[in-house]
Amino acid sequence: MLKLLSLMVPLASAAVIHRRDANISAIASEWNSTSNSSSSLSLNRPAVHYSPEEGWMNDPNGLWYDAKEEDWHIYYQYYPDAPHWGLPLTWGHAVSKDLTVWDEQGVAFGPEFETAGAFSGSMVIDYNNTSGFFNSSTDPRQRVVAIWTLDYSGSETQQLSYSHDGGYTFTEYSDNPVLDIDSDAFRDPKVFWYQGEDSESEGNWVMTVAEADRFSVLIYSSPDLKNWTLESNFSREGYLGYNYECPGLVKVPYVKNTTYASAPGSNITSSGPLHPNSTVSFSNSSSIAWNASSVPLNITLSNSTLVDETSQLEEVGYAWVMIVSFNPGSILGGSGTEYFIGDFNGTHFEPLDKQTRFLDLGKDYYALQTFFNTPNEVDVLGIAWASNWQYANQVPTDPWRSSMSLVRNFTITEYNINSNTTALVLNSQPVLDFTSLRKNGTSYTLENLTLNSSSHEVLEFEDPTGVFEFSLEYSVNFTGIHNWVFTDLSLYFQGDKDSDEYLRLGYEANSKQFFLDRGHSNIPFVQENPFFTQRLSVSNPPSSNSSTFDVYGIVDRNIIELYFNNGTVTSTNTFFFSTGNNIGSIIVKSGVDDVYEIESLKVNQFYVD
């Protein structure tokens, strides 16, 4: 069963024109005077998925952690004047202490011209002042530089802006642009610091940026963020769609359980694929470290100091992951995000295989970006836009439009595709801080129940908030099914005010697929928009090649995130009920007898303080 991770850390008036020569502090002040960030949430607006109170939002940009103030910062594509995409497009800004509840900050910066866009980019912390933008008055932990795309007059170029106040206001670099290849499809730079394997190397900045309509991710290096050298390109890999967007390259922990045999004071042997290059000795130690195929591993023995047995240990190495979004042309229609697992030597990325891997198998998960840094400098955290360009401008919300996904923690793990094949996968788990959430008394557990067609279980919520988590473990008796019968386990998430509006999700044994039906709504958009796919499914193999399946879900008013098999498969989708019709009950049923057993169903409803 998947567990939520607790993070380990101690609008604008239509008359406002966001221009470079405008005073950004004044813009922020005016925004704050016309928007009450502490006001209660709209009835259908998500509570723990970030969304601006007003205006349009799309791709996440510039994610970083302020170690001085212990604040998390996200920026995003933002048009504050209407709930649809428009120009001038700016960078919005929000801050959080816990990655769960966000404080909206308004516009961080924007382009000079009203017909221009400050398109997507990233944020770095220039600790060592390689750019020369800072002096001793700015704490090294707050020396943030934004690298972003200016889209204007048929050209896309890369720009720099820097902040002297911890990311709240920005000054544009006077010698912009820092990269111009005479292209109208050259965008979305993601920058990180590359140190290399040699701890004595000076290191340098690395940028991935999309040459969108050529299906290329260009890889540049720089000593100072201002002067860039093209090193290589990663091109025409995986699923192309119409064009590449929002690339990113990140070093991700690789975690694998394997078998070891040992005795106190002696050598250790490992059966795993990432075993030591040479013999490793220890004496009553609870942890060791080794190198395997030049991949550093930090090993923690599962039985602490009692090591005189054969048991399991957790191998932790790393691999590099190239993330590429594409739009349109996803296999589900519209927007999609894929990734490649491989190796990076500072100039070139090489995937380990030709497998195309999709980051999320739902309809509403796009443009993932990872945080530049985290408190322990090991965790890889990221956030995506929870919408789809096929219909994002038309979804029935007002005065805001669209939300972000939950923050996720990423690791590379092994995944049983079927009983004979194991592959690597980018595993993801949601990050929420429960200290920001409180139960409202609705907590329900259902255990050891065999379903039949003549009865069903009903879970009633008290004072429905529309925000809850659920964890479902179930087993399937495959010997008792007929292939001509729709053999379902179904959960109906029904609206409290109108039960004709509901989500239906569950599993069908013949197809071995988990399904979601989001089409039962009275909202015209849901019924009439042909791109708002009503019925979706994902392959859901059992856990550890057994007959037991598990799914964890978070429902947040108009969005549902599903995590299968401890996060090896995910599906993120929006849904839309009538205003204020929060989910008030869950009905569990099956159309067949003695096929499904509910081993455990746990539901907790939350308020947000």
UniProtKB/Swiss-Prot annotation:
Q: Which SMART domains match?
A: Glyco_32
**Group of enzyme by EC:** hydrolase
Q: Does the keyword Lyase belong to this entry?
A: no
Named from the GO MF annotations, one term is: sucrose alpha-glucosidase activity
Write out the residues that bind substrate: W56, M57, N58, D59, Q77, F119, S120, R187, D188, E245, W389
Record key words, sorted: Glycoprotein, Glycosidase, Hydrolase, Signal
- An example Gene Ontology CC term for this record: fungal-type vacuole
GO biological process terms held by the UniProt record: sucrose catabolic process
Question: What's its EC?
Answer: 3.2.1.26
Under which name does UniProt file this protein? Invertase
* Species of the source: Kluyveromyces lactis (strain ATCC 8585 / CBS 2359 / DSM 70799 / NBRC 1267 / NRRL Y-1140 / WM37) (Yeast)
Classification from the root reads: Eukaryota, Fungi, Dikarya, Ascomycota, Saccharomycotina
Gene name? INV1
